[in-house]
């Protein structure tokens, strides 16, 4: 199955965000053409991988 859009929702809790990093890389490898977006609290945005792993970061306050 080819996915065009994937949304990761890990808004806060640093440990949860760090544990999701390998998943983000695996999703990029498995679905190279998908747009991957991560929803996160602004204070944790620095931990979200840059492109090409994550295409867009959305902030939830």
Residue ranges: model-predicted function:
Residues 1-61:
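Catalytic machinery of carbohydrate-active enzymes
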């Amino acid at each position: 199955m080819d996915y065009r859009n994937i949304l990761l929702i890990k808004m806060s809790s640093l440990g949860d965000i760090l544990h999701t990093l390998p998943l983000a890389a695996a999703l990029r490898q498995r679905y190279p053409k998908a747009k991957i977006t991560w929803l996160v609290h602004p204070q944790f945005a620095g931990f979200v991988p840059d492109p090409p792993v994550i295409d867009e970061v959305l902030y939830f306050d």
